[in-house]
Amino acid sequence: MFAAQISTQTAIIILVLFGLAWVGFGWWLGRRNRTVDDFMLAGRNVGLALASATAMATWVTSNTTLVAPQLTYQFGVWGMIGYSMAALGLILFAPMAKRIKTLMPKGFTCGDFIRVRYGRGAWYVFLVVSFCYAMGWLISLGMAGGILLHSLSGLDYHVGMTVILAICVGYTLLGGLKAVIATDFIQTLIILCGVLFIGYVCWQDVGLERIYDSVSREQPQLLNLLFPAAIMFLFNNIFFGIGEIFHSNVWWSRAFAFREGVGKKAYLISGLLWLPIPIVTGFIALAAPALGIYPPSPDMVGPLVAAKLLGSVGAVFVFIVVFSALASSLDSLLAATSDLLTEDIYRGILKPGASNEHLFKVSKWVILGLGLLTWVLCLPRMTTLGELLNFTGAFVASTIWPIVFGLYRPRLGGVYAGSAMLLGTIIGLVAYVQIGFYVAALTSCLVSLVVCLIGLALYNDEFNWERLQRMEK
């Protein structure tokens, strides 16, 4: 085990200061929230600068700063390139965001689209898929908080995980999507500056030649461009990233919240800004052998290398950068999943007659409950972050084609869309267990595509797009 790079006392001070700052900022921003539209969708009036920043910061998750180095450490060059291909999800979602805003100007969630477009059968399947993914991502973020604190300060995993979850739940609860988007803007600046600085120090202090020599001597397979598992991971991660964004209410809620004409530009800018970040964070993992670092768990390699390069003062800097990345994703996911539970489960199934004022109160309780459930599920650290995240790939990749065809083609029916998601998920999970985590999304996406193509060939009725405009119940 490695010696802690910063003292436990310093870590606690940083957490307290940042926690008070974010929670106070969330309270200040949330003072004028009066309606469910204000709380869930920031008044549907977010401009280009904040829109681009929140999309980019949300996608720079703790997984980008912890899992990208882990996958580079395991799969080499293709690991970091494969992870960076998740930017395609943001870039390809850009035209879809415009289409979503046009079709559903009064929409709340992605669940609204599936329910109206495909009917309740496909909607139920989609909700199960979406919640399984959301909980997987929430757990990975909570775990990442505990791993971060433990790696850099020696603070117990459970303490770190609890504190970071409490901070993010606190300011999301007080400020809603306004607080999420505003803090994302600040966190984006911290992340971009921090990642570039750490990458530059690694390049200057260790050097490409030394990194290449140590990796080729100790782990030559990481430099092999024909490494079979790494190639499968590359294509798997492309479809995983696309599925994550296309189906998740995190991104749909922003499409609804952004001002008219902003969504397409914002997602394109954020995708291009995000693209190099996993390459930089993955690159530092290749320096681990040259620095004599052999982490007990591969998902600890990123913080340990960065702390080694920058020393104790630098470790504080690393801590702040990764904490910002963690918070920028956790708050967004809490808010978006709460919206889905409130709008689709509570109003859609349990209490159809609920007023907007009542939903405003319910959504806050849902955020609190989600935070508590995530904390309980994070207590046993069951797997590595990479494996947990890719487990959800089988769920999300099955939704890609039903959503794409549903937005642009009027002939795909609900039975086929629901079957595509269900069969894709099941067969993807079988592939995850029988072959490996690096093929789950690829298999799921392929099965879903086949079912959707069969549906397009056999189904003759055409959907009336005006039903989405009217938001039929």
Please provide the spans of the model-predicted regions.
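Membrane-embedded helix-loop-helix hairpins and adjacent transmembrane boundary segments
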Residues: 1-473
